[in-house]
UniProtKB/Swiss-Prot annotation:
Membrane topology: Multi-pass membrane protein
This protein's record includes keyword Cell membrane: yes
Glycosylation sites: N48, N58
Family as reported in the entry's similarity comment: Belongs to the Casparian strip membrane proteins (CASP) family.
Assembly, per entry: Homodimer and heterodimers.
Name under which the protein is recorded: CASP-like protein 2D1
Location(s) in or outside the cell: Cell membrane
GO cellular component terms listed in the entry, alphabetical order: plasma membrane
The keyword Membrane is annotated on this UniProt entry: yes
Residues passing through the membrane, by range: 16-36, 65-85, 93-113, 146-166
Keywords: Cell membrane, Glycoprotein, Membrane, Transmembrane, Transmembrane helix
Native organism taxonomy: Eukaryota, Viridiplantae, Streptophyta, Embryophyta, Tracheophyta
Residue ranges that the UniProt entry lists as topological domain Cytoplasmic: 1-15, 86-92, 167-185
Segments on the Extracellular side according to the record's topology features: 37-64, 114-145
């Protein structure tokens, strides 16, 4: 832990209000992005005379994305509210761990939907899966839009996770290297 404050440390504290503002802005931006992702996905359905009705709940990747989007929106709202309360702001490790978890969940749901979209768009002929987007074009377009919004949400949480990691680890000094040990080697 730091035992003294020097000029460089006070320079770091000068940027903390801007960092807090950027962090809060990203959290608040993630909320409408997550809500829009959920809305587009949940209301997405298309009927095809040959294959029948296709809804989001027919595909587990889309259900997972809706679940993670709901978690992202709720967590972003809770974390933004908690960042205004002084007793929670000092708990950098809580934000660090929870931001990491949410970012990892977001990237897993992006990957799952991206794989599902790739298979729906291109098919897998070696496995005898035909592409489905020619039959369900509107459905695929809305999935693509939801995937783009969810990817932007992930990017917000990725930057938030980097900021919270900086906050959690910036209270520690870098490792001390003894100059005698360096000269002796």
């Amino acid at each position: 832990m730091r035992t003294h404050i020097d000029d460089s440390a006070s320079g770091k504290n000068h940027h903390l209000p801007m960092l807090w503002f950027f962090d809060s802005s990203l959290r608040l931006c993630a909320i409408p992005l997550s809500v829009a992702t959920m809305w587009i996905t949940v209301t997405n359905k298309e009927d095809n005379s040959s294959y029948g009705m296709l809804k989001y709940n027919n595909l587990s990747a889309l259900k997972y994305m809706v679940l993670v989007s709901a978690l992202c929106a709720c967590y972003a709202l809770l974390a933004a509210a908690c960042s205004l309360v002084r007793c929670f702001v000092s708990k950098a490790w809580i934000f660090f761990v929870s931001d990491q978890i949410v970012a990892y969940l977001a990237i897993t749901s992006v990957a799952a939907v991206m794989e599902m979209y790739y298979l729906a768009y291109n098919g897998a002929k070696e496995d005898s899966w035909s592409e489905a987007c020619s039959s369900y074009g509107s459905f695929c377009s809305k999935v693509k839009l939801a995937l783009i919004l969810h990817t932007i949400t992930f990017c917000c949480f990725f930057v938030i996770a980097v900021i919270s990691a900086f906050r959690a680890f910036s209270v520690f000094d870098p490792p001390f290297v003894n100059s005698q040990e360096v000269q002796g080697d």
